[in-house]
Amino acid sequence: MGLICHLDFDIGISNNMGSRHLSRSIAMQSLYEKDFMGDKVDLEEVLERNIREFGPGLEDTDFARKLALGVAENMDKIDKIIEKAAPEWPIEQINIVDRNVLRIGLYELIYSNKEEVPPKVAINEAIELAKMFGGESSGKFINGVLGTVFKQISN
């Protein structure tokens, strides 16, 4: 899983979009590990290790921190939104990758500056993370849930 991020960095992340994509990948990996390990690990320590390991030279490390820590701070609210948007999927039954990609996507959709991260960018980036780290149907699932939430908050 980490190798993909490391390869992304090695091929050269020269623009803000690529840097943000790498930051999202690092945030997702950190949230995944915290979700998997629970109280055995500290999210901030995991995040700092992942930034060092997968993002050496990454200019905007604050974006990865903002995402991971923002998701953690708002996780209960975000999880309730997921449960409303996908009632047939209790949060604990959603694949751990998909669950954390949804959390990042919803955090960006709901809590981020819309000028900095337009909703369509937040949704597309979440779909890309799902395709990179998730299963065969992850992209469609993420798209469906985030699309549902986007329609609800747009009305």
What are these regions (language model features)?
Residues 2-139, 144-155:
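N-terminal interaction/assembly modules
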